[in-house]
């Protein structure tokens, strides 16, 4: 999917303060509190999920690798401690002959934990890929960290195969970094500052948030998914009930429906949500609004646009939230330019 940008914008990425824990998951953000939920990418290639960081020092790249290794060591220590506790429990139960069934159950659990300890160890694999940390079990790598253009790119595979090393090399050969406004010529999937070339047959689900730099209180989450994607992605992915029904002080704000329409590419769709406007004489200057529009889904490629606002004072926001009338025309220009080059 491609689209035109009417003005300067920025993508949400994995922020610098969390990059060392990028394997922990979560999602991309602008700041800790200015964020959507579930910003990342899924790619049906050994069940891959991926993230990209903002620009950071290279030490964060190495720290991210050490975190994966350290987490595995902590888990191994946790298993060893549980084994010690269970062995003490057996010693206590052996004084009572009627507890033989319980003892056998605990012994079985100990055997299972002992088997897990060597499997939990993380090994580093040398696949000949520059500036990379390839991590996994003794024979099967399933974590990939790349250092490219001062960013950390993280790929993790939840269903690696016996030939995962070769599959990782094949994937990285198709991956490349991408500048902010760069549009690749060949087919594939784009994500913030990255691109994976493919033949258009691999299922995907991507949620990436952007915002215009002159109105940072308003973020647009673009959710795209291939037809019949295995994750059964819905337009409301990452949204909560409170996003649709917000709590507010009725003396300060008036709530009303936000009903409009916009084009997603050539398709005219409804844009529905709500708005909270300050009441006259309330002394309040802040406002909030929310909207959702989508096309496709299930049998057709999905494209959804989720719009959320964040009030002045949230992290580094210094201005009040602009009204929909100020922002929606610019969003409409963007959404109308959307083009799905290869609808898989």
Q: Where do the PLM segments sit?
A:
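N-terminal ordered "arm"
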Residues: 4-26
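Surface-exposed amphipathic alpha-helical segments
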Residues: 1, 9-10, 153-192, 305-344
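Surface-exposed beta-loop interaction hotspot
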Residues: 165-219, 224-227
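Ser/Thr- (and often Asn-) enriched beta-sheet segments in non-cytosolic proteins
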Residues: 2-4, 10, 31, 35, ...
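Signature of long, low-cysteine stretches enriched in small and polar/charged residues
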Residues: 47-146, 211-299
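Long, solvent-exposed N-terminal ectodomains/accessory regions
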Residues: 21-48, 52, 59
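Secondary-structure transition/turn motif
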Residues: 25-27, 157-160, 275
């Amino acid at each position: 999917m491609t689209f035109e940008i009417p003005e300067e914008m920025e993508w949400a990425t994995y922020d610098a303060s969390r990059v060392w824990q990028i394997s922990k998951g979560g999602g991309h953000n602008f700041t800790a509190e200015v964020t959507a939920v579930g910003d990342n990418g899924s790619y049906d290639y050994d069940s891959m999920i991926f993230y990209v960081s903002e620009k950071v020092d290279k030490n964060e790249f190495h720290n991210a690798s050490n975190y994966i290794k350290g987490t595995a060591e902590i888990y191994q220590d946790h298993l060893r401690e549980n084994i010690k506790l269970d062995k003490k429990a057996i010693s206590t139960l052996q004084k009572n002959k009627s507890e033989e069934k319980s003892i056998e159950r605990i012994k079985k659990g100990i055997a299972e934990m002992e088997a897990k300890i060597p499997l939990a160890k993380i090994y580093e694999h040398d696949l000949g890929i520059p500036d990379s940390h390839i991590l996994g079990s003794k024979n099967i790598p399933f974590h990939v960290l790349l250092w490219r253009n001062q960013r950390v790119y993280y790929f993790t595979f939840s269903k690696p195969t016996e030939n995962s090393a070769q599959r990782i090399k094949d994937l990285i050969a198709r991956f490349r970094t991408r500048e902010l406004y760069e549009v690749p010529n060949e087919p594939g999937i784009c994500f913030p500052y990255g691109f994976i070339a493919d033949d258009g047959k691999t299922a995907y689900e991507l949620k990436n948030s952007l915002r215009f730099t002159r109105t940072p209180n308003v973020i647009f989450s673009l959710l795209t998914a291939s037809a019949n994607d295995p994750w059964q992605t819905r337009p409301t992915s990452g949204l909560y009930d409170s996003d649709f029904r917000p709590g507010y002080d009725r003396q300060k704000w008036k709530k009303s429906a936000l009903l409009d329409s916009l084009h997603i590419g050539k398709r005219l769709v409804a844009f529905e949500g709500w708005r909270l406007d300050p009441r006259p004489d309330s002394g309040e200057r802040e406002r909030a609004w929310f909207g959702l529009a989508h096309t496709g889904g299930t049998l057709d490629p999905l494209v959804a646009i989720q719009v959320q606002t964040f009030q002045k004072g949230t992290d580094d926001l210094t201005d009040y939230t602009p009204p929909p009338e100020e922002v929606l025309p610019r969003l409409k220009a963007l959404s109308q330019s959307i083009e799905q080059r290869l609808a898989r």
